Amino acid sequence: MFYLRGCGRWVAASFTKQQFPLVRLSSDSAAPRTPHFDVIVIGGGHAGTEAATAAARCGSRTLLLTHRVDTIGQMSCNPSFGGIGKGHLMREVDALDGLCSRICDQSGVHYKVLNRRKGPAVWGLRAQIDRKLYKQNMQKEILNTPLLTVQEGAVEDLILTEPEPEHTGKCRVSGVVLVDGSTVYAESVILTTGTFLRGMIVIGLEMHPAGRLGDQPSIGLAQTLEKLGFVVGRLKTGTPPRIAKDSINFSILNKQTPDNPSVPFSFTNETVWIKPEDQLPCYLTYTNPRVDEIVLNNLHLNSHVKETTRGPRYCPSIESKVLRFPNRLHQVWLEPEGMDSDLIYPQGLSMTLPTELQEKMITCIRGLEKAKVIQPGYGVQYDYLDPRQITPSLETHLVQRLFFAGQINGTTGYEEAAAQGVIAGINASLRVSRKPPFVVSRTEGYIGVLIDDLTTLGTSEPYRMFTSRVEFRLSLRPDNADIRLTLRGYKDAGCVSQQRYERACWMKSSLEEGISVLKSIEFSSSKWKNLIPEVSISTSRSLPVRALDVLKYEEVDMDSLAKAVPEPLKKYTKCRELAERLKIEATYESVLFHQLQEIKGVQQDEALQLPKDIDYLTIRDVSLSHEVREKLHFSRPQTIGAASRIPGVTPAAIINLLRFVKTTQQRQAAMNESPKTDQCLRNADRLQERQL
């Protein structure tokens, strides 16, 4: 057992009432005992909270280590969850019994479904969240989770031991060293460090170490990871200034009201806590040429923009937007930070100009002429680890039982972090009990696409989820995430409660029964026209028309269909969610059949496992170029399907790999079957003797 670095410099760490005793005395000895857990989670952000609670739900004794307990659940940047693609992740996290979706439903102040003009497969569930309420509700949930201990403290180093021979990796993590020199041991460790790895905050030309405004960065842990051999990169992000609510002239701005009724994030909720009529509006304004002028004239005062470090492509700073898209007007959404908050978040105005120039720029914008900046915008630069160094279970290739989740893997956004956190927590727990990993494939969920993109393609800029990244988005909809993942989460991972599992089973059987009934009801087109006059069905059709086909029409829903045919359809309208999901299933029925065939083809590729111990650099049984060997050696794909998605791995290389896998499988099968074959021959000889 060894520490990677020395423990010569330590500072005192503060602890809360929720701490475990760092020294425990056994009944027969006065010697101190070191605390031991099944899983340790480092970091209390959106990935860390989901990872810790997921591991605890799976039955593991879990420790959540965070710099400060009072920052658990803090929304460091935007006061919102969800959006296009991100709303799908929220539903999938909820399907695995994650926290953030339920907490959002308790804390939302403005709900909106984006992409309503398009089909339900790409609807984006989104909500403005009360920062204070969200943090309170999350902390209450975390501090009352069974098997979960919360501890304040900073991790300085990892405790490493000899690797398990049956797994890849040059060593195994078995605990952590805190900044005060104390040690805590565990079977698995999850890093969810966010922007804290060598984090630097930037405002204008000023830079100072911080993982977040007011919080110290993690230096020692970053050095440990680098010395272990992990490929480390550098990314940056930013946040807008906060504006005093009473200094804004809302009367001249475009007002956006919330949806009524609100669509909850969680499958367990039919409604949200704050009623639509009590929710808050958002307001829209735009930048102008004066904003461009201030940005362009002061680039020399902005070190964050001059840095070569890559920032988020899909959430750029106002400086980046002006440079990339000159002479354009850019949207600025004025979003409330809470029911009782005096602050407004100007979405679209992330900036790192000097503080005095930030207020000067903001007062150039319509409606903000008298705006007061309460907190300046700032940028953050931080370390991340190339995600091609982790497996689809989020365990690292280099260090056994060490898992990464969140921004450490190069992603951006609360939802992407939460999704990784759930998977890391589940797999860290399964690793302790030596069970197979829980992997979501590209054909099963947006979470699968997210992790597959990271582990096979990597990223050189903050990764954001979009519906356009998903090949099978008609099948992977927000409405059916429970059918896709809850059943698996219960059976394969043990992370889902009995109540949620039973609800998902009921919904699945109700949908199957409802679709079967809708298929069985057939009338002529003229009769349907008489029953539902508003439907634009052609009366020239000679064949009978199923009720399921009638439900596909935009003007028809389950209520109108049940009025036309009360028996047996009336019972399917009693549950609003069931009625809406039957409508969606009918809408996509014809295209889903073809997509399911494509999914089966992909699943066949994913079923072809590559040997875990294969050495791509030296193996001679397969013809591969040097470049392909290096790419495969670095990414270490687990299946033929994953290998085919790595840039630079040619179709010819995939064919050669496929031949190698099949030959290996045949050899293994022959070795396994040879004793059975000999026994069969002996039995046949004896039978022939008896017959003679």
Curated annotation (Swiss-Prot):
One of its GO terms (cellular component) is mitochondrion. Its cofactor is FAD. Keywords: FAD, Flavoprotein, Methylation, Mitochondrion, Transit peptide, tRNA processing. This is 5-taurinomethyluridine-[tRNA] synthase subunit MTO1, mitochondrial. Residues 669-692 are annotated as: Disordered. The keyword Mitochondrion applies. The lineage of its organism: Eukaryota, Metazoa, Chordata, Craniata, Vertebrata. PANTHER family: GLUCOSE INHIBITED DIVISION PROTEIN A, PROTEIN MTO1 HOMOLOG, MITOCHONDRIAL. GO terms for molecular function: flavin adenine dinucleotide binding; tRNA 5-taurinomethyluridine synthase activity. Residues 683-692 have a biased composition (Basic and acidic residues). The gene is MTO1. FAD binds at G43, G44, G45, H46, A47, G48, V155, S218, Q407. It catalyses: 5,10-methylenetetrahydrofolate + uridine(34) in tRNA + taurine + GTP + A + H2O = 5-taurinomethyluridine(34) in tRNA + 7,8-dihydrofolate + GDP + AH2 + phosphate + H(+). Its main location: mitochondrion.
